[in-house]
Regions:
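Surface-exposed cap/loop segments at beta↔alpha junctions
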Residues: 2-3, 8, 67-168, 364-368, ...
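Acidic, small/polar-enriched beta strand-loop surface segments
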Residues: 1-32, 195, 199, 217-265, ...
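Exposed extracellular interaction/assembly regions and N-terminal maturation sites
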Residues: 263-319, 357-362
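Oligomerization/assembly interface segments of phage tail-like spikes and tubes
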Residues: 48-69, 118-131, 255, 453-465, ...
Length: 525
C-alpha cells in the first residue's frame, strides 16, 4: 500500500505518549459502506509478509464506545462483509486523530466476537487472498480445469480471477505463453491455479492492495526512492538482531527439473553449416512436425554459433528452424548460444508456435533438466570449466565470482565461497521443481536460490517504534549497530521484507535485507 508521509506524520513518530484507535468500516460485496465502528485499541497485531500467500493478517481487541450498532450484528452478518481497517494515533499535544489505512480484509475462523458487558470487540481477519485460497472460499467445483499450451499467461491469470468475480486487477506479466498444458483436478483453488501460472517464470509476486489484485515482478527497488532515511529510522530503533543462522548458508545450489520425454528420436543426424539435419524412417505413418512435438538426437558435432535444425521424413523437408533456448524480458525468443550442444551428447528440442502461428524450435536440454551454480573465489574457465562440468555431471554449470569489484548483487568479497567455508550443497528437486522444463529456467532458479542462501549477513531484524504506514518491499535507510567493539558502520539502504506491528505496545518488528539490485539475472539481461 502506497502512502506518502508528511512532516506531521514523521513528527508524530517521536511522540512518547500516544493513544491508539481503530476504525472498522463494514462494506458489502459491492463495496458499499454499511456501517462504521470506532474505538480504542487494547491490543492486537498487524502482520505484513512479502513472502506469504496472505500478505496481510490483522487481529485486535478494541473497546467500542457505548453508542454503536455492533450488538445488532451476529457472527453470520460478518461473513458477507469486507472490513476496511484504519489505525488512528492521537497525542496529548495533537488536536486531531491521524488515521492510516491498514487495508481491506475478510473475517476468518472465529474472527468476530463481541463482549457486550465490557464493549470489547475482537477481530481476526486476512486480506482478500482468503477468498481465493479456501480460507473462506476459492475452491472450484465441476470438471477438472485445463489451461492449454500456447495461451497467453497474463490473459489466463485475468480469466482465472474472473472465476471469483475479481474485476479490479493490475497484471504486469511478461509477454509469455503457457509452455505446456496445465491441469487442475476438481477441488483445486483459484489461488493454486494463479500460483502455478505465476511461477511458470521467475520472479513474480501476487497480492491484494485493498480490493485490487496485483501480479508483477518482485521489485528490485533499484529506482525506488528511500521512503525514510537513516536520520529518521535510527532514533526509532529499540534493539537490533543481526544474528546469522549458519545452518542456512549455502554456496552450491543444484536444481533438478522435469524429465523430458521425446516423441521422435533420430539416429540419422548430419551437421553442416551450423544446421543439424534429422532424418526419420519413411515407414513411419503417424509422424508429424507440429506444435508440442519433441525431437531428440545425439549431436554429431558441436556448433560454433547459433544453429538450426531441419527435419526430413519421406519426401517432406521441414525447416530449417532456428533453435531458441530462452526468452528475454520483452518476450523475444533468444537463439541458442554457441557451443550449447556438445558433440556426443543427447538433446531434446520442442516444436512450438510463435505469436504469429509460425513453427519454431525450443531447446529443452537433455533427458533431465539439470543446472548448478557455485560461489567461488577462483572460478575455473576454459578447459578447467569443461572438466568441472564432467566432474559434476552437469553441463549447465555456472560459477559466480567473489572477486568481481563491479558486482552489484552483494557477492563481491563474500565470506561464504567454497574456498572460505568449504562446499555447502543444497539440492532442489521434485514437487514444484518438476515444473521447470528447460535448462535455462533451471539455471535462473539456481542463480536465485544460491544468491539468497549466500547473503545471510545482509539480513537484520529490528524492534522499533511503530510506523503504521510502513509496508514491505520499501527502501529505507538504517545504520547497523551490531559488530565488533568499536566497529563503525556507515548508513546503508535496506528493503523491508516482514513487518509485525504490536498494537498494544505501539512497537513493531521489521525484518529487512541490505539493498542490492534484486536478482543476478536482472543485472545480466
Amino acid at each position: 500500500m502506497s502512502y506518502t508521509p508528511t512532516q506531521d506524520d514523521i513528527r508524530l513518530l517521536y511522540q512518547r505518549s500516544k493513544k491508539l484507535y481503530a476504525k472498522i468500516t463494514l462494506l458489502n460485496w459491492d463495496m458499499k459502506t454499511i456501517d462504521s465502528l470506532e474505538g480504542i485499541v487494547l491490543d492486537g497485531n498487524l502482520s505484513i509478509s512479502a513472502s506469504s500467500d496472505i500478505r496481510r493478517t490483522f487481529t485486535c481487541n478494541v473497546h467500542i464506545g457505548g453508542r454503536n450498532n455492533v450488538s445488532a450484528y451476529n457472527v453470520y452478518d460478518w461473513l458477507n462483509k469486507y472490513l476496511r481497517i484504519s489505525i488512528g494515533e492521537e497525542t496529548p499535544r495533537a488536536d486531531k486523530i491521524y488515521w492510516y489505512s491498514m487495508g481491506l480484509y475478510v473475517v476468518t475462523q472465529n474472527g468476530f466476537q463481541y463482549d457486550a458487558s465490557n464493549h470489547k470487540l475482537s477481530l481476526s481477519c486476512s486480506d482478500l487472498v482468503g477468498k481465493l485460497n479456501d480460507t473462506i472460499s476459492g475452491q472450484l467445483t465441476g470438471y477438472a480445469t485445463v489451461i492449454k499450451e500456447g495461451r497467453d499467461i497474463r490473459q489466463s491469470i485475468i480469466e482465472t480471477l474472473k472465476l471469483m468475480d475479481i474485476n479490479k486487477y493490475m497484471v504486469e506479466y511478461w509477454n509469455r505463453t503457457v509452455p505446456y498444458d496445465l491441469e487442475f483436478s476438481t477441488g483445486a483453488t483459484v489461488w493454486q491455479i494463479l500460483t502455478e501460472l505465476r511461477d511458470l517464470y521467475y520472479p513474480f509476486e501476487m497480492y491484494f492492495d485493498e480490493d485490487t489484485f496485483i501480479c508483477k515482478e518482485i521489485p528490485d527497488c533499484k529506482d525506488d526512492p528511500v521512503i525514510l532515511n537513516h536520520e529518521v529510522i535510527d532514533p526509532l530503533v529499540i534493539r537490533e538482531n543481526a544474528t546469522i543462522d549458519e545452518t542456512e548458508v549455502r554456496n552450491c545450489t543444484e536444481i533438478w527439473g522435469a524429465s523430458i520425454d521425446s516423441d521422435w528420436y533420430s539416429a540419422d543426424v548430419s551437421f553442416s553449416g551450423n544446421n543439424y539435419t534429422l532424418k526419420y524412417d519413411d515407414a513411419l505413418t503417424d509422424f508429424e512436425v507440429k506444435s508440442n512435438k519433441k525431437f531428440s538426437f545425439v549431436v554429431p558435432e558441436t556448433h560454433t554459433e547459433g544453429c538450426t535444425v531441419t527435419i526430413v521424413q519421406k519426401n517432406n523437408t521441414y525447416g530449417p528452424f532456428t533453435i531458441y533456448e530462452g526468452t528475454d524480458k520483452d518476450g523475444n525468443d533468444v537463439p541458442i548460444k554457441a557451443g550449447r550442444m556438445l558433440k556426443g551428447k543427447y538433446y531434446v528440442v520442442k516444436c512450438y508456435k510463435d505469436t504469429e502461428k509460425n513453427l519454431r524450435m525450443q531447446f529443452l536440454g537433455q533427458s533431465q533438466v539439470h543446472a548448478m551454480v557455485i560461489l567461488s573465489d577462483n572460478p575455473p574457465t576454459g578447459a578447467a570449466l569443461e572438466q568441472a562440468k564432467k566432474d559434476e555431471a552437469c553441463d549447465v554449470l555456472e560459477y559466480i565470482s567473489t572477486t568481481n569489484a563491479s558486482d552489484t548483487t552483494g557477492m563481491y568479497k563474500s565470506p561464504f565461497s567454497i574456498e572460505k567455508i568449504g562446499r555447502r550443497n543444497r539440492i532442489y528437486s521434485g514437487s514444484d521443481y518438476e515444473n521447470i522444463y528447460t535448462d535455462d529456467l533451471a539455471l535462473q532458479r539456481a542463480e536465485y536460490e544460491n544468491w539468497k542462501s549466500s547473503r545471510l549477513t545482509d539480513a537484520v531484524s529490528v524492534e522499533m517504534v511503530m510506523i503504521p504506514w510502513m509496508d514491505v518491499n520499501q527502501k529505507i535507510g538504517y545504520t547497523i549497530r551490531s559488530g565488533r567493539p568499536g566497529e563503525k558502520h556507515e548508513p546503508a539502504e535496506f528493503i523491508t521484507k516482514e513487518i509485525s506491528m504490536q498494537l498494544g505496545s505501539g512497537t513493531m518488528t521489521v525484518s529487512m535485507q541490505r539493498f542490492y539490485p534484486y536478482y543476478p539475472y536482472i543485472i545480466k539481461k
